[in-house]
Amino acid sequence: MIEIQFYNSLSGRKEKFSPSDPNRVTVYSCGPTVYNFAHIGNLRAFLFVDVLRRSLKLLGYGVDMTMNITDIDDKIIRDSIASKKSIIEFTAPWTKAFFEDLKTVSAEILEHYPKATDSIPEMVDIIQKLQKKGLVYEKDESLYFSIQKFQNYGKLSKIDTSGMKTGTRYDTDEYEKEDVRDFVLWKSPKLEGETSWYTLVGTGRPGWHLECSAMIRKVYGSGVDIHTGGVDLLFPHHENEIAQSEGAFPEESFVKTWLHSEHLLVDGQKMSKSKGNFYTLRDLIQQGLDPKAIRFLLISTHYRSKLNFSTDRIAEASANIRKIQNCLDRILELEPDIKADFYFLFSIPFVQTWKKEFEESLADDLNISKALAVVFESVKQINSLLDTNQSDSKQRIEYIQILAYFDRILGVLNFESKKDLLDSEIDSLIEERQIARKNKDFARSDAIRDQLLAQGILIEDTKEGIRWRKK
């Protein structure tokens, strides 16, 4: 087990990670609101959770991880009523799409995916405890949290509530840090057909912020070692989670370490449907982009740095995967009978060094950029050793093992011996590429080119037309 340093948003500095039980690190991550397809900004946050999970396991920790499904909120209420469907009918296909997207980008399945609507009793219990402590008031049959009565409000976002006017409040789930007000815990129904529950705290439905506090309590009984989410959730959502949970259960530790992933930009700008730069995973795949390249790009920048998504960056990600895969394929051609039962025991000193440096990079607040530098340096050295025939079978198998070790985080490599394409398959792909170029579908054209290059096929434009040859 390797010591980890995480940047804790609560303290604003890197800290030694000290879970309650290293064999069962508890992690809660804010998941999707299932009213539409997740966009690639959401996907970056979900893949950050995947890298966190894979890294904890690789560094020797046991994990027990949760990502919630928000299946009741303002947007879902609005759209379900408009579509004349029940909440369950409306959210079911979007929930299914979320899991399909996770599978497409090779995200590992977590232990728990609770739905908000399955935790109503826990929400009611939290409200009742807050009421007993005088932290709740009622207005127009809805219940609100009085933040001025909670001494530690603002400790995560460092917000100053001293200038707040008493009794100002928000019914909406999302608002800006500059306009802090009391937030709603339980909403009375306002619209015809609005989903409601009949409970001891009244008829209505939960506010968004209450849902995560309740699901954490339902899954884990108390608090967690790590809570993650996008930086946009730090305020008000996570600040309000702290207020609710610590207000109701002041004797318990709610969250030890807060980790927040930064925004994703598209061509240097914030994603916006009006700007035409708003993409879902399915949009990108329909354009011919490789899901592995999308995954690689989204995990390749440190989670606390903004990531710029562009076609150039996708092409770069494809090239980087190809660089690693080509190295692996060279070894597999020499060792075609190797089985995929990797044991990760290394005897070669420089391979041991690669492993150690890779682990140390991840243990330093998931420094993926530094970890990737180790990967590419190892690929460079392996290729050099193969070029000069300086490796025997035992050593080559160890090279495969270290690439597999790296792929425990990357999740983009294929360890099956390369199957050569038939000539007819190559001709068919080249014809498809020509059609794509004619239609100015350059993303698909480039994807086919990359696929052929990965198979060792070079395309040449000649006066007589397109020719291809094997490297």
From Swiss-Prot:
Keywords: Aminoacyl-tRNA synthetase, ATP-binding, Cytoplasm, Ligase, Metal-binding, Nucleotide-binding, Protein biosynthesis, Zinc. This is Cysteine--tRNA ligase. InterPro entries: Cys-tRNA-ligase, Cys-tRNA-synt_Ia_DALR, Cys-tRNA/MSH_ligase, CysS_C, Rossmann-like_a/b/a_fold, tRNA-synt_1_cat_dom, tRNAsynth_Ia_anticodon-bd. Binds 1 zinc ion per subunit. The keyword Cell division does not apply. ATP binds at residue 273. PANTHER family: CYSTEINE--TRNA LIGASE, CYTOPLASMIC, CYSTEINYL-TRNA SYNTHETASE. Its cofactor is Zn(2+). HAMAP family: Cys_tRNA_synth. Zn(2+) binds at residues 30, 212, 237, 241. It is found in: Cytoplasm. GO terms for molecular function: ATP binding; cysteine-tRNA ligase activity; zinc ion binding. The keyword Cell membrane does not apply. A motif ('KMSKS' region) lies at residues 270-274. It catalyses: tRNA(Cys) + L-cysteine + ATP = L-cysteinyl-tRNA(Cys) + AMP + diphosphate. It comes from the Bacteria. It is an enzyme of class 6 (ligase). One of its GO terms (cellular component) is cytosol. Pfam families: CysS_C, DALR_2, tRNA-synt_1e. It comes from Leptospira interrogans serogroup Icterohaemorrhagiae serovar copenhageni (strain Fiocruz L1-130). Monomer. Belongs to the class-I aminoacyl-tRNA synthetase family. GO terms for biological process: cysteinyl-tRNA aminoacylation. A motif ('HIGH' region) lies at residues 32-42. Its EC number is 6.1.1.16.
